[in-house]
Amino acid sequence: MFGDRQRPMVLVLGLGESGLAIARWCARHGCRLRIADTREAPPNLAALQAEGIDAEFVGGAFTPALLDGGIEIVGLSPGLSPLEPALAALVAAANERGVAVWGELEFFAQALRALGTSGYQPKVLAITGTNGKTTTTSLTGLLCQRSGKKVAVAGNISPAMLDRLASAIDETALPDVWVLELSSFQLETARTFAPDAAAILNITQDHLDWHGSFDAYAQAKGLIFGATTTRVLNRDDAAVMKFAPAAGAADAPRTVTFGLNEPTQDGDYGLSRDNGIAWLVEAVDRDAPDEATTTRRRKRDAAHTPDIAQKRLMPADALRIRGLHNAANALAAFALARAIDLPAAPLLHALREYRGEAHRVEVIATIDDVDYVDDSKGTNVGATVAALDGLAQKIVLIAGGDGKGQDFGPLVAPVARWCRAVMLIGRDAPVIRDTLAETGVPLAGHATLEAAVHAAAELAEPGDAVLLSPACASLDMFRNYAHRAEVFRAAVDAIAIDKGATP
């Protein structure tokens, strides 16, 4: 379970969800435990004690002295930035001493490897990206389930991977397929993780305070791929396509792309438009035998030039999730499921079935022919750009909060194209206002979200959408993004009551 180590002594840094899962897993396998947190009494300490886990707890600043006493593995929680000086010093000391530094994902990878010696060989699918991870992960899980597979969905989406694995072992119900949502934080400490197929949905500015630079952030995303992992890449995103193998590279892993245009390479996915209808399509070689339309395509002669046709899969409007960005998410999920040779028919039925996730471009009400859309999970600029372009209608946008040092410049073009007005809230409202001034779109600041919603309702015209997609974190005004969504919904409910409508 721990490489070549038998019941090692483990130092767990940070007692969040992943840290607690690491502690549980290590205790389950007889490891000696030391747990450290910068907080003297982190919330999960009570859970640790209630479960009877025998561990030494140390609260306070991290120091290299935490490694003393025979520590063999450091288990690092994903919320801890490696750039924080005290943590960086501790990790450097661990490296000098030859102490392994793993995150939960590496513990999980090592556990699957150990279980493999007993014959357990599941398929593993993984998803990362700045935006769309949860939707695509949930959808991929549903697709695999509707194909008759026993599926476990875990990771950044919750539950923690190790907790889900432990429960599957206890219930003697190990899944056929693991579908993992993985953040850049979780991937940062990946060492031997090698899923069967993995997707990078997009890479835009986010978490730069944690990674230090955009390049470091993108590099962490790329750690989702093992040497033989099928790569599912968004061809519309230049940062993502940097992970495509060089043309003609020897022993290059299989690569499948998806995008919002017509695919031109055999086996890729995209959108094709005909008579005003957008279709989800797969590019297929007309000259290929039928069996070559599966993901295990036979190698072609180098001189063969494919005659590409667009094989229609389903109309994009048949998806219950709205927006072009969700069509892209659906294509990514379909590509992942096909990468492990699941049959297409049940996958297409499942695509029509999926209703989406809360707070992700979720239409919560239509009042006087105006849609009210909750995208409170849109905590970065890329998410808001995707929501604006995806809805593709006139919009009164509500944005603002803690911008986390982002560049708001990418909002200019979609705001100019789609927005009737922008209502601004939160700490970085002035920064967003300055950035959007060149659009010529009316901009108004509001002290509360409730005030912004009511003002947006007054400006919206029939056929418009009032969209909460803040492009910012929520903690300057709310407990979290879900609380922000609750306030938005309550304000919309109040508008419905005022207008005598049913939200």
From Swiss-Prot:
It is found in: Cytoplasm. GO terms for biological process: cell division; cell wall organization; peptidoglycan biosynthetic process; regulation of cell shape. It comes from the Bacteria. It comes from Burkholderia orbicola (strain MC0-3). ATP binds at residues 129-135. Its EC number is 6.3.2.9. PANTHER family: UDP-N-ACETYLMURAMOYLALANINE--D-GLUTAMATE LIGASE. It catalyses: UDP-N-acetyl-alpha-D-muramoyl-L-alanine + D-glutamate + ATP = UDP-N-acetyl-alpha-D-muramoyl-L-alanyl-D-glutamate + ADP + phosphate + H(+). The gene is murD. Coiled coil: none annotated. This is UDP-N-acetylmuramoylalanine--D-glutamate ligase. Belongs to the MurCDEF family. One of its GO terms (molecular function) is UDP-N-acetylmuramoylalanine-D-glutamate ligase activity. Pfam families: Mur_ligase_C (PF02875), Mur_ligase_M (PF08245), MurD-like_N (PF21799). Cell wall formation. Catalyzes the addition of glutamate to the nucleotide precursor UDP-N-acetylmuramoyl-L-alanine (UMA). Keywords: ATP-binding, Cell cycle, Cell division, Cell shape, Cell wall biogenesis/degradation, Cytoplasm, Ligase, Nucleotide-binding, Peptidoglycan synthesis.
